Every structure is written in structure tokens, then in C-alpha cells.
């Protein structure tokens, strides 16, 4: 129960006081992610230098889970190589599907606060929206 309370605090903090929810006009990778089931809608904006993500932000509206997940994700990927960011995304998706090892989950740091979402099927798409958008953006499906 103590852990669940801690995880709820993490999610609430990232939803109420997101560090990365703002515009990023000079982003060179921009992609919209939409969850039509509940109306979550984010625009992921990344600034890159070669293979490194140097800055990132998101704008949009959605439930607390989608907003917190996107904010946590950006905190994890800024400063990382694109390849490493994609690996984090793959691990996050594995965690949500209940397929990640404890070591992999620990490597997700604050994103592990979303691990129990796997038991809430209606919220899975909310949690993975930012991560799926990241994968699409880094694999060349961005809009300009």
C-alpha cells in the first residue's frame, strides 16, 4: 500500500506540475498522438542533434495518466540517443503488458509508477500514448 501511495504521488506531481508541458517552437521532430477512446491528444515535440535528443516538450490535453506518462517519458529521454530512447519505450510497453522483468522495471525509474496500469485495460492506451508517439516520431512518421 505504501508503494501505491508513492506511485500516486509521482503521477499526481507530473500531472499537476509537468516539467515538459510547454511549446517547443524550434523542435525538429513533431508528431500528434491521439487516443480516440478517451480523447487524449498530445503533440510531442523533440529537438535533436544528430542521434541525440537534446530537448523535448509536449502540449495537448488528456487524462492524468496520459499527461503524467508523457511528462515522465520526456524527463527520461532528453539527453539520450534516439536508439536508447526507443529501447526505454520498448521496455515501458513490456512493463504495461506485464512482460518486463523486475530489473527492466527498475531501469524505468519514475515510469515504473505506471506498472499497475496493466491491470486496468481501459487505461493502458492512456499510459502508452506518449511512448507510442515517441516511437512513431523517431521512426520517421513525424509531421512538420
Residue ranges and their predicted role:
Residues 1-25, 80-144:
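C-terminal binding/interaction regions
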Residues 17-60:
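Structured beta-strand/loop patches that form or line metal/cofactor-binding pockets in enzymes
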Residues 69-79:
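Alpha-helical support elements that line or immediately flank enzyme active sites
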Residues 61-67:
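Short, thiol/selenol-centered motifs that function as redox-active sites or metal-ligating centers
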Residues 67-68, 87:
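Alpha-helical macromolecular-interaction surfaces
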Residues 42, 71, 125:
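Active-site phosphate/pyrophosphate-handling residues
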Residues 38, 63, 126:
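Functionally engaged cysteine thiol sites
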